A protein has these predicted regions:
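Proline/glycine-enriched tight loop/beta-turn segments at coil->beta junctions
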Residues: 81-87
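Surface cap/lid and interfacial helix-loop subdomains adjacent to catalytic sites
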Residues: 165-175, 198-351, 384, 388
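Gly/Ala-rich beta-loop-alpha elbow adjacent to hydrolase catalytic centers
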Residues: 184, 188, 192
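Hydrophobic membrane-insertion alpha-helices, especially the h-region
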Residues: 11-22
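N-terminal hydrophobic targeting segments that direct proteins to the cell envelope
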Residues: 22-69
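Single conserved hydrophobic/aromatic residue that forms the stacking wall/gate
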Residues: 1-9, 13
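Structural recognition of the beta-strand scaffold that forms the well-ordered cores
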Residues: 88-91, 134-137, 181, 211-214, ...
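Active-site catalytic motif of lipid deacylating hydrolases and related acyltransferases
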Residues: 27-46, 82, 92-179, 342-390
């Protein structure tokens, strides 16, 4: 089936937020109910894995310059995009699989692939004015993996990472000597952290990596030097060869509970309430001042609810059109909290159901709240990189 794409406005987030916000409320009764619904039916070692992707094959990519008119190429105003790009981006999509096997197939005629397309529209599209976009479809770990305590979740995440790593090696072959960005969200960011730690940090590739946008998965400040011994964190809007990260919350909210994390010593549980590495996605600094988004018109409106909540039970794709636009006069304020979270406040935010739920976590809009700001920052860092090369 072939989804339809357009650029019309929409205002539906509730169902998507409800599903993704469960990620941050591990101890909640609601999560335990849903968790049992999606818990894999057998141990990882008894589970026959899906066939591995072959990244020489175009069909193993969710986005690729040869895949024309995909959702990653959407723009809010039908902007004409330049054919030639001076950079590439390796985009690692978040979890979209809520099935009862440990790892997803890369079959494109599935609800989880349709959700990948929604993520391409809502996240990867921020890079399409400046970069050739490469996004591997990989055997992502099921959503339940993050909460499993038997070790099977780690194994599922390790299998997913193996695919991402193989795709990255092919990406390097495909782009030649072009500079590149890394961009990721949620599960994708967990894999991105490991990829950069193993294959970019301290190598010549770090000089070609303009920046890494590692969004929506916590990185403890205390783990930065364990993960990245040479690469610096970005402290200004134009800095290059550096790392950017944030997790978005409502004013005064925190991230509670635990998540799996990886560093060169292995896997561990991290407490999300500890101090995190964070960047303000409007000022692109690491200070704690409130910054206004006034008149920036940077917030992306994206309708993909039917691909998320109904996909938990639906066996077939919905073929619902993916629609993006920019909100006008999307005024709110952003600062880094004392714990490194991107904390936001303002009346505009009331339209997002994550705030209305009173949970305070805006994981579902980590990218779309700052879509225009990301887009401009990518241009700025790319131009700065090219100036330095000349």
């Amino acid at each position: 089936s072939t989804p339809l794409y357009s650029s019309a406005a929409s205002d539906v987030y509730k169902r998507q937020a409800l599903v993704l916000l469960l990620f941050y409320f591990r101890e909640a009764i609601l999560f335990r109910i849903v968790g049992q619904m999606i818990k894999p039916s057998m141990a990882f070692d008894n589970f026959e894995p899906p066939p591995p992707p072959n990244y020489k094959n175009l069909n193993s990519w969710a986005a690729h310059p040869y895949l024309k008119n995909g959702p990653d190429q959407l723009t809010p105003n039908n902007e004409n995009l330049d054919f030639f790009k001076n950079a590439a981006v390796f985009y690692i999509h978040p979890t979209g699989y809520f099935g009862k096997t440990w790892n997803a197939t890369i079959d494109k005629d599935t609800p989880h692939y349709e959700r990948t397309e929604g993520m391409l529209a809502g996240q990867a599209s921020a890079f399409n004015a400046s970069c050739d976009i490469y996004a591997p479809e990989y055997r992502q770990a099921t959503f339940f993996s993050f909460f499993d305590e038997t070790g099977d979740g780690q194994k599922a995440l390790a299998r997913a990472y193996e695919d991402v790593e193989n795709a990255f090696f092919e990406f390097l072959e495909l782009i030649g000597d072009k500079p590149f960005f890394i961009a990721s969200h949620s599960q994708g960011t967990l894999h991105g952290q490991q990829l950069i730690s193993k294959h970019i940090d301290g190598t010549d590739l770090s000089k070609r990596m303009i920046a890494a946008y590692l969004i929506g998965y916590p990185i403890l400040k205390s783990d930065i030097k364990k993960l990245f011994k040479k690469i610096e964190i970005c402290k200004s809007p134009e800095q290059v060869n550096c790392l950017i990260a944030w997790c978005t919350v409502d004013e005064m909210a925190n991230l509670d509970g635990e998540s799996w994390s990886w560093d060169p010593s292995g896997w561990k549980r991290l407490n999300r309430n500890d101090s995190l590495f964070g960047t303000n996605p409007i000022s692109w600094t690491v200070d704690n001042e409130w910054i206004s988004t006034e008149q920036r018109n940077s917030v992306l409106d994206l309708d993909i609810w039917d691909q998320t909540i109904k996909g938990l039970t639906r066996k077939e794709p919905s073929d619902v059109p993916i629609n993006i636009s920019l909100f006008e006069n999307a005024d709110f304020h952003v600062r880094l909290s004392s714990k490194g979270l991107a904390e936001v406040k303002g009346n505009f935010l009331k339209r997002f159901d994550a705030v209305e739920f009173g949970l305070g976590n805006l994981h579902v809009v980590d990218y779309s709240l700052f879509w225009g700001s990301i887009r401009e920052n990518v241009k700025l860092r790319l131009n700065e990189y090219l100036k330095k090369q000349n």
